[in-house]
Amino acid sequence: MKPMLFAILLATAAPALADTLYTNANGYTLDAKGTLQRFATLVVADSGPQQGRVKATLKAGAALPAGTRIDMQGATLWPGLIDAHGHVMRLGELKLVVNLRDTASIAEAQARIKAGIPAVGWIMGRGWNQERWYENGKLVGRFPTAAELDAVTGDRPAAMSRVDGHALWVNNAAMTAAGITKDTPDPDGGQIIRDAAGNPSGVFVDKAMALVARAIPADDDARLDLVLTKSLETMAEVGLTGAHDAGMDKDTWDRYVRFAKAGKLTARIYAMAGGPENRKAIAPNGPIPWSINDLVAMQAMKLVSDGALGSRGAYLIAPYEDMPSTRGLEILKPEQLKSLVTDASRDGFQVNVHAIGDQANRSTMDAFAAVPPAERIARRHRNEHAQIVDMADLGRFASLNVIASMQPTHATSDKGMAEARLGEARLKGAYAWQQIKTSGAQLALGSDFPVEPPDPMFGIHAAVTRQSRDGLPAGGWRPWEKLSMLDAFAGFTTWAARAGHAEAKVGTLEPGKWADFITLERDPFTAPPGDLWKIKVTATWLGGKQVFKRK
């Protein structure tokens, strides 16, 4: 028999190896009861109707089935991590504009802007935070001005988004392009920061940002595809196999679907339509369940009830401690919020409301209370951020079956500013993860990327230690609100999966679920808590396919 014919007959006669076995792993997953389970081998189906899904996890010493074996050499293996609140396109955009994150002074921000000026078009940037700027050893604290931006941009229009996306710093050329003058009124739910003479000084807060944004040229398809690609690369690098996109439009949804169909979407996206208009444009016939190999879903609508604490847009019950002339910005009036929530809920959608200030949180919970109880349970409505909650309202998360979607690194980044803005009394219900969990409510954890870095190990570190990455303060900030390592792990896996109506598909490595998993360079369950943020993901798999490997 000729060698080639023999090889063909042998290949035909021998059964194909239908599974891949990831052996010698230091594996962790939760089970359906939330109990931590350990395993040494992960079995993934490579063909048939279960292709890309988990077939089994096996303890050390268990008999191994037939299949292709990959020795993990003792690497720690976790389910893929899920960020319950991020901004996918903004994350990729940060790679393509001037990055002002971590600038320590106005001068440093100016230097970065000057170095990053593109050849043509508007000069765009993101990430500044006046609460991190110092001059001569003193906190600047004030907003930057158009004149300070003019100094490095000249007559080219420039717009720099604050780190939280709730304020825009622009130069005079940008205001001219947008037709902004002294006579331009503040819009409802927004504020134009002005000088002593009443002239716009260069910063636009919350809904006032739209006055300038309308003049910024739209990106073309090629650039937006690049933005999404950059975001997906970043997510895979930090072990995110899923993200809940907190507010997007139809164009973005269509882009996700196109990428998913082309096999280019390397993370599962649970999309929240940005407001009622986008909800109706994307899903006129009702929620879109998980589809295209469970890569995309659009079952939720995002609403914004107030602004952010850093720009004093968070809407408070009482005035700000450090600026008694304001209580913040009420972006949606209570009756308007209630109407939007109940209408979308009636149409079958989960409603996820951004609420930071205690008054915004109260109004948000009042709106959820207007939804019939059985409907609330089915929809799994969410309070996004739940950052400053009056003590009288903390128990309402559990009683109303509202998920608290919270971001641990917000607490560790905001701690000093929060003390100045709020005072001690209001801090009792601020960033209150443990109190909300102990009340019987469900949490879901995320980062709010790119407001905070997307690395979920940063979030797990913040949840467990209540410290910033420099180890401060000793013992943690308001340490009674710390979460256990197990809860932090659940927050970025099973809790986040349930918050996206995906607990039957992802979040654990149980049989039948997608084989979304990661390996890490160290075991977070045995590492010192202060080192958690340093642990790097070494590889990421989505549906059994490797989408990232650290070099």
Each language-model region and where it sits:
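Non-cysteine beta-strand/loop elements that form the S-adenosyl-L-methionine
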Residues: L295-G313, N401-T412
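N-terminal signal peptide c-region/cleavage motif recognized by signal peptidases
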Residues: A13-A14
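Sec-dependent signal peptide recognition
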Residues: M1-A7
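Divalent metal-binding segments
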Residues: D19-N24, Y28, G34-F39, V43-A45, ...
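P-loop/Walker A phosphate-binding loop and immediately adjacent motor/lid segment at beta-alpha junctions
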Residues: G530-K551
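His/Asp/Glu-enriched, well-ordered alpha-helical/loop segment
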Residues: L226, V341-N352, I356-H381, H385-A386, ...
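Acidic (Asp/Glu)-rich catalytic clusters
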Residues: A260-G263, P287-V296, F397-N401
